[in-house]
Amino acid sequence: MIGVAWMVIAASLLGCSAFAEVTETFKIVNWNVLYGFNHKKSVKQGANWIKKQAADVVALQELNGHNQVGFKELASEWGHDHAAILKKGGFPVGLTSNKPIEVIERRVKDFHHGYLHCKTHGIHFFVVHFWPGKYWEADWILDKTAPLIERGEKVVILGDFNGNSRKDEDFLIANATLRKRDYTFVDKVEAKGFVDIVHKHDPEAKISQPSPITIPRWTKDLKELKLKRYRIDFVFADKSFAEQSHSGTISLAREIETISDHYPVIVEFNGALSP
């Protein structure tokens, strides 16, 4: 009895830390950074914003002007020692992580922008930048994910979809009157059981693009901007892994508006993951 009493006292003094299960949080940021962070004018500001998020994995699109060496150096500014970029030139996508990255495939052939398939933290990441109307790009990637999911692997598809979600339809009809609605990419992904993490946790988050940085080059004024705003940037997780998610949203921070025309997607999962 004395031994049990001492255990109870010790547990209370330690805040029960020795007896409680520790739950880790895993954080992902996905962001289209507008021609390499506003045509490379806002690289430092973009890196600083990412650093403040303290994410475990960062997926980026439109890394124009960056190559593998430079991208790895840039990733170190937000505390990531590991980075992979799709290609040199054009509109590359990339992935950074605070754990080692295994590059499984860099696919450019037959794609408009291409995609990057990497594994880090025990998760398969497909970083995409779909081209409007090329729906078979999604089919190709989904064919790649099918055997992974059958084996019980964790899979995330994330990036700029250049398409919409039917879950946003009411918002789109009422607000994005200057946009055409195209649900095909998202329909295909959801038909395979993938879960839209932002909609799961923050169904009111309907805007990921454009920001006021598009004025006046691509947008006349704020009035027109409001009629163009919609959500085309997504993080999808396979059904099983999605059960571990505990938050998902889109940051509309004012500082983003001098860095990119897209707003970043931020999602978090519970539980310790594999290295």
Q: Where are the regions a protein language model picked out?
A:
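Active-site surface patch of divalent metal-dependent phosphodiester/phosphate bond hydrolases
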Residues: 38-108
